[in-house]
């Protein structure tokens, strides 16, 4: 049975993850979360977002998995994610034998937020040399080298970014966006809700309308979707949920919510929103 362990702090989450690995779970994953307010005008660090995408990608790729465990703080229960269908619709899987147009693949990678470089060194980048494409997915621990025979994907191998040496062969490569911002931006471009320009400012609004992704899009997730998701929306219905140190977790959550409410009022006042618009 899949397992979700909810703990008060990230430090305890790290200890629980290590303990579950020692207990023999095939896959024990730490789901990182931010302690910052969701109304900050900037997104959480890449490490947090990429860590979340790694777990979410695994869940979307194998929704019926029964041998994994996830450990997270109570923050994972708060709405902070796009709905699963929205993330799944932008996720692409490449398998051996697939017919792939390399020019279209490059366009797809750009849309997902990947940066084209000469040599792969970190997550979120890709390169191409003839019929060889290297991609470092943000949802993977190692980059993958794709070798094509014409338009047919002939080989997929992980490789060491330091030495560029090929490692183990893999059956498939799952590509997610490099962050949640592009999904929010796409949805807002479709909806164009009232008050968006006032919230973003002229420059960011112009960037959005030009097809870009302004910084801090994640704070507008509640405008993009009527009900943003939490980790609970991604895990299987059969998941066993364990809450450790419940009182400590509740106290920690209440303290964070008080900070968030205060910050929300400050941001609304700065934006010049009236009482009804602040709700």
Language-model features and meaning:
Residues 1-279:
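ASCE RecA-like P-loop NTPase motor cores
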């Amino acid at each position: 049975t899949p397992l979700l362990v909810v703990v008060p702090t990230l430090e305890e989450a790290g200890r629980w993850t290590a303990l579950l690995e020692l207990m023999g779970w095939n896959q024990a994953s730490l789901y990182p979360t931010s302690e910052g307010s969701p109304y900050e005008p900037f997104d959480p660090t890449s490490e947090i977002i990429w860590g979340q995408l790694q777990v979410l990608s695994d869940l979307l790729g194998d929704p019926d998995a029964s041998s994994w465990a996830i450990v997270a703080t109570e923050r994972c229960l708060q709405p902070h994610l796009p709905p699963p269908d929205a993330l799944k619709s932008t996720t692409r899987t490449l398998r051996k034998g697939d017919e792939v147009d390399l020019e279209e693949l490059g366009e797809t990678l750009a849309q997902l937020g990947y940066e084209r470089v000469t040599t792969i060194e970190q997550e979120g980048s890709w390169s191409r040399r003839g019929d060889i494409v290297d991609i470092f997915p943000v949802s993977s621990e190692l980059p993958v080298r794709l070798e094509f025979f014409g338009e047919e994907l002939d080989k997929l191998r992980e490789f060491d970014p330091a030495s560029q040496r090929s490692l183990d062969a893999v059956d498939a490569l799952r590509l997610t966006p490099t962050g949640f911002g592009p999904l929010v931006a796409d949805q807002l471009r479709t909806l164009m809700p009232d008050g968006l320009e006032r919230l973003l400012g002229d420059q960011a609004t112009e960037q959005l309308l030009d097809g870009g992704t302004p910084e801090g899009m994640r704070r507008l997730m509640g405008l993009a979707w009527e009900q943003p998701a939490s980790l609970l929306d991604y895990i299987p219905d059969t998941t066993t949920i364990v809450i450790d140190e419940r009182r400590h977790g509740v106290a920690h959550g209440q303290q964070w919510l008080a900070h968030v409410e205060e910050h929300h009022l400050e941001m609304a006042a700065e934006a010049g929103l009236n009482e009804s618009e602040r709700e």
